[in-house]
Design a protein with these regions (language model features):
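Ligand-site clamp/hinge motif
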Residues: 1, 104-149, 164, 177
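Aromatic- and charge-enriched surface segment that lines or borders ligand/interaction sites
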Residues: 1-28, 50, 130
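Solvent-exposed coil/turn segments that connect beta secondary-structure elements
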Residues: 1-2, 15, 46, 54-58, ...
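Surface-exposed binding/hinge segments that line
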Residues: 10, 31-74
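Alpha-helical secondary-structure segments
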Residues: 11-18, 50, 84-85, 112-115, ...
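Alpha-to-beta junction loops
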Residues: 15, 47-49, 132-141, 156
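Gly/Pro-rich hinge or "lid" segments in bacterial periplasmic/extracellular proteins
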Residues: 57, 62-117, 123-125
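Ligand-binding "clamshell"
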Residues: 148-160
Length: 178
């Protein structure tokens, strides 16, 4: 099973409580607008949740995997306890977060580092310089205009990773030839 950072086993009750939190009027969750089509949530045993939607939604698998939707222990939506590979040690908004490896992480072969420090560097040039100078070990959201500069540096590895982002192509199907 999947364990929370506090050792509690995650159950369908936790999933339902978390989604209800994200859908709540007062939650402030960035995901609340994504979940408006959820009509009800029902536990079907300890490890299964049934989502009833207002109507069919082909994007629903993408919606429920949105990074804003964190699953927390029922009754504890604010402490930061989760199920991820790293446990939050400190958080200074807009400055940095420090995380340590979760020794009970449920995905084997992951969470390789003992500790991770996430530093907020807003300025793109400062971020690029920090990577080039070895002040940071990794960065995301590389500016495509400067990616070739990084590719020329033998000490920098560019990783292109597939995500859940997708593009739609809306078409008006009510007129010919459709």
């Amino acid at each position: 099973g999947v364990e929370f950072h506090n050792g509690k086993t995650m159950t369908s009750e936790d999933v339902i409580a978390s989604y209800n939190h994200h859908m709540g009027e007062d939650s402030g969750s960035a995901a609340s607008g994504l979940l408006t089509a959820v009509k009800s949530l029902t536990a079907d045993g300890k490890n299964r949740v049934i989502f009833e939607l207002e109507s069919a939604n082909a994007d629903f698998p993408f919606i429920v995997s949105d990074y804003h939707i964190s699953i927390r222990p029922a009754g504890d939506m604010t402490s930061g306890v989760g199920t991820g590979g790293y446990i939050l040690q400190s958080f200074d908004p807009g400055v940095k977060s420090v995380l340590k490896r979760n020794p009970n992480y449920w995905k084997e072969g992951r969470a390789h580092f003992d500790e991770v420090e996430l530093i907020s560097i807003i300025d793109p040039t400062a971020r690029q310089n920090a990577l080039m100078n070895g002040e940071i070990d990794a960065m995301d959201r590389v500016d495509l205009k400067t990616i070739n500069l990084f590719k020329r540096n033998p000490d920098i590895n560019i990783m292109d990773i597939t995500g859940t982002a997708h593009y739609t192509f809306p078409m008006r199907l009510s007129v010919d030839p459709f």
